[in-house]
Amino acid sequence: RSVIMQVLGTYHHNFVTHLLEAELQRQVYALAEAGQSITAAVLNQCKGNILSAFWGDTVEIDDGARMTWMRQPHYYMGLYPYTYSVGLVASTAMANLVRDQGPPAVKRWLQVLKAGGTLRPLELLQTAGIDLSTPQPIHDAVAYVGRLIDELEQSFAG
C-alpha cells in the first residue's frame, strides 16, 4: 500500500499540480503579450478560474486556493512545470515498453541515452518507440494510474 500511495502521489503532483501550473503560466503569458498588467488580483482570478474549471463542483475553491501561485518558485525560475508531466508520461511509456517487449525496448532506451541531446526531444523519444505527438501515451499513463487505484482499493477490501 505504501508504495502504491507514493506512486499515486507522484502522478497526482506531476499530472495535476504541474499541469495546472503550466496552464496558469500559459494564461499569464497571453495576458502579458496582450499588454495587460499582471497584478496579484489578476493572478488570483486566473488561478481561481483554472481550479474551478478543472475541479468543477467537486471541490470548493476558496481564497487560499486562488493564492497558491504565490508559493511556487517555478514561476520565478525558468517556468518549466509542464516538463514534469511530460517526463512522467514518457517514463511510464518506456516502462510499459520494457515490460511488454523486454530486451529490444531496453536496447532502444540505451540508444536514446547514448544519443543524449543530439536530437529534438520528440525525435529522441521516437527512437525509443514513444510517440508523444499523439495523446496515446497520456491515455496509457492515466490507465496505469487507474490500475494502481484499483489495486489499492483491493488491498483495503481484503
Question: Where would I find each of the regions flagged by the language model?
Answer:
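Acidic/histidine-rich catalytic neighborhood
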Residues: R1-A32
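C-terminal, non-catalytic "cap/extension" segments appended to globular domains
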Residues: A22, V28-G158
